[in-house]
Amino acid sequence: MGQSKKLNKQPSSLSPLVQLAGIRKCFDGKEVIPQLDLTINNGEFLTLLGPSGCGKTTVLRLIAGLETVDSGRIMLDNEDITHVPAENRYVNTVFQSYALFPHMTVFENVAFGLRMQKTPAAEITPRVMEALRMVQLETFAQRKPHQLSGGQQQRVAIARAVVNKPRLLLLDESLSALDYKLRKQMQNELKALQRKLGITFVFVTHDQEEALTMSDRIVVMREGRIEQDGTPREIYEEPKNLFVAGFIGEINMFNATVIERLDEQRVRANVEGRECNIYVNFAVEPGQKLHVLLRPEDLRVEEINDDNHAEGLIGYVRERNYKGMTLESVVELENGKMVMVSEFFNEDDPDFDHSLDQKMAINWVESWEVVLADEEHK
């Protein structure tokens, strides 16, 4: 959201590595992916993001060759791999369970794929140790999986996946089993490792924060379809529809009705009972219903007294939560709607905290809002 600034768009010079064209997949007669087209570029960290059952893991398994498409084509480096068996694709997968062999040492787990490929014996030790160095586990080579922490097991699984030097690494919710602190650490390590290796990563998650943190590009999915495809900043600041807006982070959705268009950019509208100017980049008519979307951190609040004449939306503080860097307040508007406001904490301001039931005026910087048509009344 926010200022009309250039977002961190992907460079257009990236070359395609994987192309999915017209992909359709059914399970037990139920269509889970009706028609999907997706291009994954060389060297990027792409995340498939969506709620449970949206089809993201199915897409991953189709790329890996663990499921077969009902129709459509999958290309890897301009080669049609639609019907190529999984073991013959230069693609490796790290599963949520890691799937390490418990009776083997870390070294043997990582070496397993090389032995299966009949790699010359003289190459195995240097390649395994190189992979373990990449994930900072070279001193753990002789340990068994049960002697490792969850984060270390995850890194062994990644080392085992990259030792074969795949063109593409697929990760299926592979951080979800870790505790919060370790998950944050592994997010940073995984992104740094991807940059170091230069391998294309495709990561599946339902965790929005994880996707925003790690990805070069995010593909938001729902019911087997792509809802939006863009950089993390584009997805967060310029959601294309209400589903994406509501799924990615906290957001306030205000109901609005068009009064009149003022100029090419601005529209006068009734927003939750108050007249405001909003920026609308599509054609509207008087009386048309709209949604005005604003992140909690994009709202500006001011304490007012009963006799103050204030601009903006008027409400009362019903909850306030100190979060360290921020103060989060829930403000109830005069029409009963609850609004979330997030302010950066100012320890030098003794009046920064708000009392419960304090009357507030809510405003925002013009053009920071995202305005969408009402999908029910188009």
Swiss-Prot record:
- Task performed by this protein: Part of the ABC transporter complex PotABCD involved in spermidine/putrescine import. Responsible for energy coupling to the transport system.
E.C. numbers: 7.6.2.11
| Record-annotated ABC transporter domain positions | 18-248
- This protein is called what? Spermidine/putrescine import ATP-binding protein PotA
Presence of keyword Transport: yes
List the molecular function annotations (GO) for this entry: ABC-type putrescine transporter activity; ATP binding; ATP hydrolysis activity
Instruction: Record the organism.
Output: Shigella sonnei (strain Ss046)
Name the residues that bind ATP.
50-57
The lineage, from the top, is: Bacteria, Pseudomonadati, Pseudomonadota, Gammaproteobacteria, Enterobacterales
